[in-house]
Amino acid sequence: MDYYDVLGVSKTASPEEIKKAYRKLAVKYHPDKNPGDAEAEKRFKEVSEAYEVLSDAQKRESYDRYGKDGPFAGAGGFGGAGMGNMEDALRTFMGAFGGEFGGGGSFFEGLFGGLGEAFGMRGDPAGARQGASKKVHITLTFEEAARGVEKELLVSGYKTCTTCSGSGAANERGIKCCERCKGSGQIVQSRGFFSMASTCPECGGEGRIITDPCSNCRGQGRVKDKRNVHVQIPAGVDSGMRLKMEGYGDAGQNGAPSGDLYVFIDVEPHPVFERRGDDLILELPIGFVDAALGMKKEIPTLLKEGTCRLTVPEGIQSGTILKVKNQGFPNVHGRGRGDLLVRVSVETPQNLSEEQKELLRKFSSTEKAENFPKKRGFLDKIKGFFSDFTV
């Protein structure tokens, strides 16, 4: 039996052409469409065996070079048991049609694989499950968030058992392939046109049975652990951001990769600065004399220098914002820095002495309209309504 002839394709056929040919023939000879037809059942097994080999690049290369008795062949040829078992043929059928149900390697995985990922544990039909992802919260000071910092976290979870290297068995002879599911972890049953797969009750979906479990992990392949993890937090992070550390979650099972560690950031508020994106806002209260005459003032910053000199122009009004470029927060993606926005608040004096009041009265007597352009404009607008108003 030549596998290419069975599928009706050339030896140079692409993987897509091979899959297309198999799907057409598998549907044609599927037992649900041909109940009681022994010849159709035989053809279904043959096309499934051919597809199992030709759809695998490594097996196909070996088949092209050595034929059915190549180094990857089992006791019954490339199909393991020559596809004599209908269960194997149905499993191959589901694998070929699995991509239509979520892109998984089988019908069962296509339906249910996404749920495992949502909870941080991805699995395959042979029972290998990625370790669960972990999450921790870390609180930073405002300054630490601005400059970046390295933190050490204590993380509890599971690590790979060093005694058995994650196999769960005391030695190599302590593991055997599950005879019921032949290592797939699934039992395939025909339920209408699309066959269904269920977890193998013999091995619990693991695809293998541990006959001599490891004494350290009791057959689990991993043990509870607490470890210190060093986290390098970049400058510019903000509350609500998270860092992903691949492979720092729980150890996987049956050789599957470890989960990830997610570090959620909280940043404490600052008594002086307010953050808005990459910009910093500083409220600067000044007296009305400084507002009128202008001034130069040292103001705080988050840079190493600690301060910078700000020029307040004369005649500045309350609420005016002065921008100091590149004195804000660093961008977490390395795109420069934000600005320092200084919001001026002109404070009206309180608790004046008689001498101060007298000086203000003298100043008031010298006021001119051009000293208060907003006041003059306001009075001009309402002059027609209130005749007793004078300037």
UniProtKB/Swiss-Prot annotation:
Start-end of each CXXCXGXG motif repeat: 161-168, 178-185, 200-207, 214-221
GO molecular function, one term: unfolded protein binding
Cofactor list: Zn(2+)
InterPro entries according to UniProt: DnaJ, DnaJ_C, DnaJ_domain, DnaJ_domain_CS, HSP40/DnaJ_pept-bd, HSP_DnaJ_Cys-rich_dom, HSP_DnaJ_Cys-rich_dom_sf, J_dom_sf
Any one of the GO CC terms: cytoplasm
Residues where Zn(2+) 2 binds: C178, C181, C200, C203
Compartment(s) of residence: Cytoplasm
Keywords for the protein's UniProt record, in alphabetical order: Chaperone, Cytoplasm, DNA replication, Metal-binding, Repeat, Stress response, Zinc, Zinc-finger
CDD domains in the record: DnaJ, DnaJ_C, DnaJ_zf
PROSITE patterns: DNAJ_1 (PS00636), DNAJ_2 (PS50076), ZF_CR (PS51188)
Binding partners and assembly: Homodimer.
Stated role: Participates actively in the response to hyperosmotic and heat shock by preventing the aggregation of stress-denatured proteins and by disaggregating proteins, also in an autonomous, DnaK-independent fashion. Unfolded proteins bind initially to DnaJ; upon interaction with the DnaJ-bound protein, DnaK hydrolyzes its bound ATP, resulting in the formation of a stable complex. GrpE releases ADP from DnaK; ATP binding to DnaK triggers the release of the substrate protein, thus completing the reaction cycle.
Domain remarks in the Swiss-Prot or TrEMBL record: The J domain is necessary and sufficient to stimulate DnaK ATPase activity. Zinc center 1 plays an important role in the autonomous, DnaK-independent chaperone activity of DnaJ. Zinc center 2 is essential for interaction with DnaK and for DnaJ activity.
Name under which the protein is recorded: Chaperone protein DnaJ
Gene that this polypeptide is encoded by: dnaJ
